[in-house]
Amino acid sequence: MTLLFVGRGNANVCYLLSGEVYRISLRHQKLSRNNAYVQDNFQFIDSKIRSLPMLADVVVSMRLEEVFVDTKWINVLKDENILIDDSHMQCIVMPLLHAKDSTCEQLDHFNQIYRCSLNDAITWEFKPKWLYQSSDYCRNCTHNSLKGRDIEYCFLHDPELIIETLFAGRQVPEEFLDDILQYLQSSDSITQRLYAAQRFVKDDLSTLMTLRDVTCFLTWSRNTRSVKATIIDVDQKPANKLRHWQSTESALASFPGKKKAHFNHQ
Protein backbone atom coordinates (compact mmCIF):
# COMPACT_ATOMS: atom_id res chain seq x y z
CA MET A 1 0.00 0.00 0.00
CA THR A 2 1.29 3.42 -0.98
CA LEU A 3 1.57 6.41 1.34
CA LEU A 4 0.53 9.79 -0.02
CA PHE A 5 1.76 12.93 1.74
CA VAL A 6 -1.17 15.10 2.87
CA GLY A 7 0.30 17.87 4.99
CA ARG A 8 2.43 18.95 7.90
CA GLY A 9 1.73 20.80 11.13
CA ASN A 10 4.06 22.21 13.75
CA ALA A 11 4.27 18.88 15.55
CA ASN A 12 2.81 16.27 13.20
CA VAL A 13 2.82 14.98 9.66
CA CYS A 14 -0.11 13.37 7.81
CA TYR A 15 -0.20 10.66 5.15
CA LEU A 16 -3.09 9.15 3.22
CA LEU A 17 -3.26 5.36 3.38
CA SER A 18 -6.19 3.29 2.05
CA GLY A 19 -8.38 6.40 1.88
CA GLU A 20 -7.74 7.53 5.47
CA VAL A 21 -5.41 10.12 6.98
CA TYR A 22 -2.76 8.80 9.37
CA ARG A 23 -1.51 11.54 11.67
CA ILE A 24 1.98 10.97 13.08
CA SER A 25 3.31 12.89 16.05
CA LEU A 26 6.67 14.64 15.68
CA ARG A 27 6.52 16.37 19.06
CA HIS A 28 9.36 14.32 20.55
CA GLN A 29 12.57 12.92 19.06
CA LYS A 30 11.89 9.36 20.21
CA LEU A 31 9.07 7.21 18.83
CA SER A 32 8.29 5.80 22.29
CA ARG A 33 7.72 9.29 23.71
CA ASN A 34 5.53 10.21 20.75
CA ASN A 35 3.52 7.03 21.30
CA ALA A 36 2.87 7.95 24.93
CA TYR A 37 1.93 11.50 23.92
CA VAL A 38 -0.52 10.34 21.23
CA GLN A 39 -2.32 8.07 23.70
CA ASP A 40 -2.58 10.86 26.29
CA ASN A 41 -3.64 13.35 23.63
CA PHE A 42 -6.39 11.06 22.32
CA GLN A 43 -7.75 10.77 25.86
CA PHE A 44 -7.64 14.58 26.23
CA ILE A 45 -9.56 15.09 22.98
CA ASP A 46 -12.29 12.65 24.00
CA SER A 47 -12.65 13.85 27.59
CA LYS A 48 -12.15 17.62 27.16
CA ILE A 49 -13.09 18.59 23.58
CA ARG A 50 -15.53 16.05 22.17
CA SER A 51 -17.46 16.17 25.46
CA LEU A 52 -18.35 19.86 24.97
CA PRO A 53 -22.03 19.87 23.96
CA MET A 54 -21.67 22.68 21.40
CA LEU A 55 -18.83 20.86 19.59
CA ALA A 56 -19.63 17.17 19.98
CA ASP A 57 -21.03 16.75 16.47
CA VAL A 58 -18.38 18.80 14.65
CA VAL A 59 -15.13 17.44 16.12
CA VAL A 60 -13.59 15.25 13.43
CA SER A 61 -14.20 11.53 13.84
CA MET A 62 -10.99 9.72 14.73
CA ARG A 63 -9.63 6.52 16.15
CA LEU A 64 -6.39 5.51 17.81
CA GLU A 65 -4.54 2.85 15.83
CA GLU A 66 -1.33 1.01 16.62
CA VAL A 67 0.55 0.27 13.40
CA PHE A 68 3.57 -1.93 12.90
CA VAL A 69 6.62 0.08 11.87
CA ASP A 70 7.36 -1.59 8.55
CA THR A 71 9.60 -0.28 5.77
CA LYS A 72 7.25 2.46 4.58
CA TRP A 73 6.87 3.89 8.09
CA ILE A 74 10.57 3.47 8.86
CA ASN A 75 11.34 5.70 5.88
CA VAL A 76 8.84 8.33 7.07
CA LEU A 77 10.22 8.37 10.61
CA LYS A 78 13.83 8.51 9.42
CA ASP A 79 12.99 11.41 7.11
CA GLU A 80 11.56 13.22 10.16
CA ASN A 81 14.64 12.39 12.28
CA ILE A 82 12.61 10.35 14.77
CA LEU A 83 14.58 7.74 16.74
CA ILE A 84 12.81 4.40 16.21
CA ASP A 85 12.92 2.78 19.65
CA ASP A 86 9.62 0.89 19.40
CA SER A 87 8.27 -1.71 16.96
CA HIS A 88 4.85 -0.05 16.76
CA MET A 89 3.59 3.48 16.27
CA GLN A 90 0.45 5.07 17.72
CA CYS A 91 -1.45 7.04 15.08
CA ILE A 92 -4.61 9.08 15.09
CA VAL A 93 -6.58 8.06 12.00
CA MET A 94 -9.11 10.46 10.47
CA PRO A 95 -11.09 10.90 7.24
CA LEU A 96 -9.77 13.09 4.43
CA LEU A 97 -11.88 16.24 4.65
CA HIS A 98 -11.68 17.31 1.02
CA ALA A 99 -11.99 15.51 -2.29
CA LYS A 100 -8.85 13.51 -3.10
CA ASP A 101 -8.64 14.99 -6.60
CA SER A 102 -9.10 18.60 -5.46
CA THR A 103 -6.51 21.34 -5.80
CA CYS A 104 -5.54 23.67 -2.97
CA GLU A 105 -5.53 27.46 -3.29
CA GLN A 106 -4.08 29.65 -0.54
CA LEU A 107 -6.26 32.70 0.17
CA ASP A 108 -4.27 34.36 2.95
CA HIS A 109 -2.38 33.54 6.16
CA PHE A 110 -5.36 31.79 7.78
CA ASN A 111 -7.42 30.52 4.83
CA GLN A 112 -7.26 28.12 1.90
CA ILE A 113 -9.77 26.30 -0.28
CA TYR A 114 -9.84 22.90 -1.97
CA ARG A 115 -11.94 22.48 -5.08
CA CYS A 116 -12.52 20.08 -7.94
CA SER A 117 -12.32 21.12 -11.58
CA LEU A 118 -16.12 21.45 -11.90
CA ASN A 119 -16.48 23.42 -8.64
CA ASP A 120 -19.21 20.99 -7.55
CA ALA A 121 -17.59 20.59 -4.14
CA ILE A 122 -15.53 23.21 -2.32
CA THR A 123 -13.88 22.88 1.07
CA TRP A 124 -12.80 26.02 2.91
CA GLU A 125 -10.13 25.55 5.58
CA PHE A 126 -9.52 28.35 8.08
CA LYS A 127 -8.26 29.12 11.58
CA PRO A 128 -10.56 31.51 13.48
CA LYS A 129 -8.14 31.63 16.46
CA TRP A 130 -9.25 33.61 19.54
CA LEU A 131 -12.98 34.29 19.46
CA TYR A 132 -13.98 34.75 23.09
CA GLN A 133 -11.79 37.12 25.09
CA SER A 134 -12.28 39.09 28.27
CA SER A 135 -10.27 42.12 27.11
CA ASP A 136 -11.79 45.28 25.65
CA TYR A 137 -9.87 44.79 22.39
CA CYS A 138 -10.14 42.12 19.70
CA ARG A 139 -7.18 39.81 20.10
CA ASN A 140 -7.25 38.58 16.48
CA CYS A 141 -7.42 42.03 14.89
CA THR A 142 -4.81 43.45 17.26
CA HIS A 143 -2.44 40.53 16.67
CA ASN A 144 -2.77 40.92 12.90
CA SER A 145 -1.86 44.61 13.27
CA LEU A 146 1.10 43.74 15.50
CA LYS A 147 2.33 41.23 12.89
CA GLY A 148 1.81 43.67 10.01
CA ARG A 149 -0.77 41.45 8.32
CA ASP A 150 -3.09 43.33 5.98
CA ILE A 151 -6.26 41.57 7.16
CA GLU A 152 -9.30 43.80 7.59
CA TYR A 153 -11.98 41.19 8.30
CA CYS A 154 -12.60 39.41 11.59
CA PHE A 155 -14.26 36.04 12.11
CA LEU A 156 -16.32 37.63 14.89
CA HIS A 157 -17.71 40.42 12.79
CA ASP A 158 -19.44 41.07 9.44
CA PRO A 159 -19.56 37.75 7.50
CA GLU A 160 -20.21 39.68 4.28
CA LEU A 161 -16.82 41.38 4.58
CA ILE A 162 -15.15 38.00 5.18
CA ILE A 163 -16.69 36.57 2.00
CA GLU A 164 -15.94 39.68 -0.07
CA THR A 165 -12.33 39.85 1.10
CA LEU A 166 -11.43 36.19 0.73
CA PHE A 167 -13.30 35.21 -2.42
CA ALA A 168 -13.20 38.33 -4.60
CA GLY A 169 -11.93 37.28 -8.05
CA ARG A 170 -11.63 33.60 -7.08
CA GLN A 171 -14.15 32.33 -9.67
CA VAL A 172 -16.17 30.29 -7.22
CA PRO A 173 -19.89 29.63 -7.83
CA GLU A 174 -22.37 32.25 -6.65
CA GLU A 175 -24.31 29.45 -4.98
CA PHE A 176 -21.24 28.69 -2.85
CA LEU A 177 -20.93 32.32 -1.76
CA ASP A 178 -24.65 32.56 -0.97
CA ASP A 179 -24.74 29.32 1.02
CA ILE A 180 -21.54 30.04 2.95
CA LEU A 181 -22.72 33.55 3.82
CA GLN A 182 -26.06 32.24 5.03
CA TYR A 183 -24.24 29.63 7.11
CA LEU A 184 -21.87 32.16 8.71
CA GLN A 185 -24.80 34.41 9.59
CA SER A 186 -26.61 31.60 11.40
CA SER A 187 -26.52 31.21 15.18
CA ASP A 188 -25.34 27.62 14.65
CA SER A 189 -22.24 28.50 12.61
CA ILE A 190 -18.90 27.01 13.61
CA THR A 191 -17.58 30.42 14.67
CA GLN A 192 -20.57 30.95 16.98
CA ARG A 193 -20.11 27.47 18.39
CA LEU A 194 -16.41 28.02 19.00
CA TYR A 195 -17.10 31.38 20.64
CA ALA A 196 -19.55 29.65 22.99
CA ALA A 197 -17.10 26.81 23.69
CA GLN A 198 -14.21 29.18 24.43
CA ARG A 199 -16.42 31.15 26.78
CA PHE A 200 -17.64 27.94 28.46
CA VAL A 201 -14.07 26.77 29.28
CA LYS A 202 -12.56 30.21 29.97
CA ASP A 203 -11.30 29.10 33.39
CA ASP A 204 -9.67 25.91 32.04
CA LEU A 205 -6.53 27.29 30.37
CA SER A 206 -5.37 24.01 28.82
CA THR A 207 -8.67 23.40 27.04
CA LEU A 208 -9.12 27.08 26.19
CA MET A 209 -5.74 27.28 24.44
CA THR A 210 -6.61 24.21 22.37
CA LEU A 211 -9.88 25.80 21.26
CA ARG A 212 -8.03 28.97 20.28
CA ASP A 213 -5.91 27.07 17.76
CA VAL A 214 -8.31 24.68 16.03
CA THR A 215 -8.69 24.44 12.27
CA CYS A 216 -12.18 24.55 10.73
CA PHE A 217 -13.33 22.89 7.51
CA LEU A 218 -16.54 23.96 5.78
CA THR A 219 -17.44 21.60 2.95
CA TRP A 220 -20.02 22.78 0.43
CA SER A 221 -21.85 20.62 -2.12
CA ARG A 222 -23.51 22.10 -5.19
CA ASN A 223 -25.82 19.07 -5.47
CA THR A 224 -27.29 19.36 -1.98
CA ARG A 225 -26.59 23.08 -1.37
CA SER A 226 -25.38 22.02 2.09
CA VAL A 227 -22.49 23.16 4.29
CA LYS A 228 -20.87 20.61 6.61
CA ALA A 229 -18.60 21.87 9.41
CA THR A 230 -15.72 19.92 10.94
CA ILE A 231 -12.95 20.98 13.32
CA ILE A 232 -9.51 19.41 13.61
CA ASP A 233 -6.24 20.26 15.40
CA VAL A 234 -7.86 19.76 18.79
CA ASP A 235 -4.67 18.60 20.50
CA GLN A 236 -3.60 19.43 24.03
CA LYS A 237 -0.99 22.18 24.06
CA PRO A 238 2.35 21.62 25.82
CA ALA A 239 2.80 23.48 29.10
CA ASN A 240 5.90 25.30 27.83
CA LYS A 241 3.75 27.15 25.27
CA LEU A 242 2.22 29.16 28.10
CA ARG A 243 5.29 31.41 28.37
CA HIS A 244 5.04 32.25 24.67
CA TRP A 245 1.33 33.07 25.00
CA GLN A 246 2.00 35.24 28.05
CA SER A 247 4.73 37.23 26.30
CA THR A 248 2.46 37.74 23.28
CA GLU A 249 -0.35 38.96 25.52
CA SER A 250 2.00 41.45 27.18
CA ALA A 251 3.04 42.79 23.77
CA LEU A 252 -0.59 43.10 22.67
CA ALA A 253 -1.68 44.82 25.88
CA SER A 254 0.89 47.57 25.33
CA PHE A 255 0.45 47.77 21.54
CA PRO A 256 -0.77 51.27 20.57
CA GLY A 257 -2.82 49.96 17.63
CA LYS A 258 -5.24 47.85 19.67
CA LYS A 259 -8.52 47.15 17.86
CA LYS A 260 -11.83 47.55 19.67
CA ALA A 261 -13.58 44.29 20.54
CA HIS A 262 -16.53 43.40 18.32
CA PHE A 263 -18.53 41.72 21.11
CA ASN A 264 -19.39 43.02 24.55
CA HIS A 265 -17.66 40.25 26.50
CA GLN A 266 -18.80 39.36 29.98
Swiss-Prot record:
It is an enzyme of class 2 (transferase). Disulfide bonds: none annotated. It comes from the Eukaryota. It catalyses: 1D-myo-inositol 1,3,4,5,6-pentakisphosphate + ATP = 1D-myo-inositol hexakisphosphate + ADP + H(+). It is found in: Nucleus. A motif (EXKPK motif) lies at residues 125-129. Keywords: ATP-binding, Kinase, Nucleotide-binding, Nucleus, Transferase. One of its GO terms (cellular component) is nucleus. Has kinase activity and phosphorylates inositol-1,3,4,5,6-pentakisphosphate (Ins(1,3,4,5,6)P5) to produce 1,2,3,4,5,6-hexakisphosphate (InsP6), also known as phytate. The EXKPK motif is conserved in inositol-pentakisphosphate 2-kinases of both family 1 and 2. This is Inositol-pentakisphosphate 2-kinase. It comes from Kluyveromyces lactis (strain ATCC 8585 / CBS 2359 / DSM 70799 / NBRC 1267 / NRRL Y-1140 / WM37). The gene is IPK1.
